[in-house]
Amino acid sequence: MASTLFYNSMNLSAAVFSRTHFPIPINKDFPLEFSPCIHTDYHLRSRTRSGQKKCLTEVRATVASPTEVPSAPASTQPKKLRILVAGGGIGGLVFALAAKKKGFDVVVFEKDLSAVRGEGQYRGPIQIQSNALAALEAIDMDVAEEVMRVGCVTGDRINGLVDGVSGTWYVKFDTFTPAVERGLPVTRVISRIALQQILARAVGEEIIINDSNVVNFEDLGDKVNVILENGQRYEGDMLVGADGIWSKVRKNLFGLNEAVYSGYTCYTGIADFVPADINSVGYRVFLGHKQYFVSSDVGGGKMQWYAFHKESPGGVDSPNGKKERLLKIFEGWCDNVIDLLLATEEDAILRRDIYDRTPILTWGKGHVTLLGDSVHAMQPNMGQGGCMAIEDGYQLALELDKAWKKSSETGTPVDVASSLRSYENSRRLRVAIIHGMARMAALMASTYKAYLGVGLGPLSFLTKFRIPHPGRVGGRVFIDKAMPLMLSWVLGGNSSKLEGRSPSCRLSDKASDQLRNWFEDDDALERAIDGEWYLIPCGQDNDASQLICLNRDEKNPCIIGSAPHGDVSGISIAIPKPQVSEMHARISYKDGAFYLTDLRSEHGTWIADIEGKRYRVPPNFPARFRPSDAIEIGSQKVAFRVKVMKSSPGSVEKEGILQAA
């Protein structure tokens, strides 16, 4: 006996169709297992002042004699070289850790570690790719293990580029194979706050002076004095400027040199949202004309997204207007984009203009050098900005250690300047190439055109003919050939410089057995979607109808008609409308896909995709439909939107359906 669902204009809770928002405080997204409060009694003495209070969350650091800079751990032979680091971001902390592990005295000056330097909030979680994880392993295996444990693995799934409107795959990236073949860790995504706290704890609270903003320095030849915003001075043997894209150290080295505006502003947010394909897809870049959108799994049932839009810098949104503006900008795009926007609270959306810096040949002078964004700030499209800073930190510590060993062998003073130039020379070419790749990736993502006519104004009518744009076709051929080589070099090109690290992979990083099949077969990837399929009313005559949860039992199809049919096998769905025939259509399931069969209905059955292509289903012939398609029963007035969701039916009614039309 079939179970029957009646469809009419019965009242249904408005919650089913509400656009639910989820409160997502950025600073609570990734709780850590260790205490957020760190205390220190680290003492340094200023040349001008004493007794000043500092704080790192709740860190106190009084000023004492420079000669009382904490020594290296007992397990490491101290090396009489004091290194001053301007900036306690990821690059500065990684270098400080690497230098500390080599036995050097290190002091890190950070203007506001407790706020993740502001940029951590704007830039959200950070992708630590295989090359950077390997460098962390070479620096400190325990720290690398903790980062990989706290982070969310994305490299074991499909990643790549998709069409922003249709949601279809353009190019897939294989970041798993290059890592495994070279014995590297698999790419992770981790909260910036979590990463910074892991690094700060490993560096040691006694080494970091918070609330200390380096604004200038004096290179005295064999010594360097740093000058803080409050007038205090500290002396060291060298200075590393790791103070970000707006670096004061860089400015004082080379004069004022404006950062380059990318042409894009970026909105970012985190949503409590789990896509139906979470087990098979790690991150996606949705391509469009003068705009693009990036989404990534960051673990813990959350998704991070970035929305890029071409416009002049300095724009300001109206109060509580960011989300509304984004929904207008990305109107008509696929559900993967719109659902994330709808699931994000207004207060969780942040905006910043994107800048980078053109690579320069000279990174430093004398006993001063630069590291990370202070010298090679990149656009975020490659996910390699932080990774390059980590590689910088490893290489700089290595070159200083080589100089120290040479000094010990020859009995001569450490040649600090030569070691800094050696570091700069070893990093310059690789960083410049990846910087250029990041710019090129932004250009490609925002100039993508699916069909002829896109962006052509009066000729935009050509898009209805769906003639593939030549750039799209040629670009795909090029990327298919170049991407494997590029990824292999980006992820593994620095491995030979990691002294003492043995190539190795973790069994826990094992990918799905279907990964290779998913790369080669879009259909197999779609069939792997693990979620509930729903038909959501979107027609004029059935807005108040209940949603339909489709049955994945191959032996029990759904029968749609104007009246219930208790004498058929399966679920009978009754839609008492004049356009619906008594026995109108059947929805069946087979091998991970759903099919719609018209049962010789009087008014016909149609399927329309998200791009507007509409066709009539032939009688008695099963036609496959896909997520985001619209199914019309008899006419456009009785229509349903196909949606696949990870949520159970109970939570769907509780939280509300997202985009339904």
Curated annotation (Swiss-Prot):
Segments forming domain FHA: 558-607
InterPro entries tied to this protein: FAD-bd, FAD/NAD-bd_sf, FHA_dom, SMAD_FHA_dom_sf, Zeaxanthin_epoxidase
Protein's UniProt keywords contain Oxidoreductase: yes
Chain positions recorded as FAD binding sites: 82-110, 360-373
Annotated pathway: Plant hormone biosynthesis; abscisate biosynthesis
Cofactor(s) needed for function: FAD
Enzyme Commission identifier(s): 1.14.15.21
Pfam families: FAD_binding_3 (PF01494), FHA (PF00498), NAD_binding_8 (PF13450)
One MF term in the entry's GO annotations: FAD binding
Subcellular compartments: Plastid, Chloroplast
Catalytic activity, reaction form: all-trans-zeaxanthin + 4 reduced [2Fe-2S]-[ferredoxin] + 2 O2 + 4 H(+) = all-trans-violaxanthin + 4 oxidized [2Fe-2S]-[ferredoxin] + 2 H2O
Keywords per UniProt: Abscisic acid biosynthesis, Chloroplast, FAD, Flavoprotein, Oxidoreductase, Plastid, Transit peptide
Transit peptide, from-to: 1-50
One Gene Ontology term from the biological process aspect of the record: abscisic acid biosynthetic process
A GO cellular-component term linked to this record: chloroplast
Primary role: Converts zeaxanthin into antheraxanthin and subsequently violaxanthin. Involved in the epoxidation of zeaxanthin.
Name the UniProt record assigns to this protein: Zeaxanthin epoxidase, chloroplastic
Species in which this protein is naturally found: Prunus armeniaca (Apricot)
